[in-house]
Amino acid sequence: MHFLTQELSFPNTNESTRDGLLAIGGDLSTQRLLLAYENGIFPWFEEGEPIMWWSPRQRMVLFFDALVVSHSMRNVINKNIFKVTFNKAFREVIQNCQSVKREGQHGTWITNEMIESYCKLHELGKAISVEIWQNDTLVGGLYGVDMFPVFCGESMFSKVSNASKMAFISLADYLKTNHYNLLDCQIYNDHLNSLGCREIPRDEFLKFLKK
């Protein structure tokens, strides 16, 4: 595990710890963030902690043909109860991802500094949001970093049932249509697994990132 200086560089991802921690320090400038994502590295830390950079040995990803859409979710889609937009409310989406209550979590890893940094990426066209609306109210969404041919998903939120699933499915459809290789979901969880995501070795993930 390495300590970063102001120099714009990262250690080799193979030098990460067993749990995936690669480096501590540096900053959240757009240049450093883009360099990180180009090399399969992402920031993840809580308010008050130093900036921590991660590159897990196993990467959770979605190959689009493996996407699982349940029968009940297909009914939701067919009823047109949600409106889907892209890049209409990026800041609102990331702020909701920051503030939403999550089971088992007492804090948030989306700091105020991180919000400003990702909003700058969005202004550069490198960060994308998906918004889910119901009766003109934002009820769900997600955001991530566009590193074509890979999209790096960061976080999603839902204020009503199925809203975040709708965002995820809509994003997957958009990425498949536009010839992306895969959707990076970073770390395993049961919810992502239920949607068809699976883990692949880091080296395999990096090959997709470099294609």
From Swiss-Prot:
Broad EC category: transferase
Q: Where in the cell is it found?
A: Cytoplasm
> GO molecular-function annotation terms?
leucyl-tRNA--protein transferase activity
Reaction catalysis annotation: N-terminal L-lysyl-[protein] + L-leucyl-tRNA(Leu) = N-terminal L-leucyl-L-lysyl-[protein] + tRNA(Leu) + H(+); N-terminal L-arginyl-[protein] + L-leucyl-tRNA(Leu) = N-terminal L-leucyl-L-arginyl-[protein] + tRNA(Leu) + H(+); L-phenylalanyl-tRNA(Phe) + an N-terminal L-alpha-aminoacyl-[protein] = an N-terminal L-phenylalanyl-L-alpha-aminoacyl-[protein] + tRNA(Phe)
Task: Print the keywords alphabetically.
Answer: Acyltransferase, Cytoplasm, Transferase
**A single GO CC term, please?**
cytoplasm
Per the UniProt record, which EC number(s) apply here? Answer: 2.3.2.6
| A GO biological-process term | protein catabolic process
As for what it does, the entry says:
Functions in the N-end rule pathway of protein degradation where it conjugates Leu, Phe and, less efficiently, Met from aminoacyl-tRNAs to the N-termini of proteins containing an N-terminal arginine or lysine.
* PANTHER family from the UniProt entry: LEUCYL/PHENYLALANYL-TRNA--PROTEIN TRANSFERASE, LEUCYL_PHENYLALANYL-TRNA--PROTEIN TRANSFERASE
> So what family is this one in?
Belongs to the L/F-transferase family.
Record NCBIfam families = aat
Q: What is this protein called?
A: Leucyl/phenylalanyl-tRNA--protein transferase
What is the primary gene name for this protein? aat
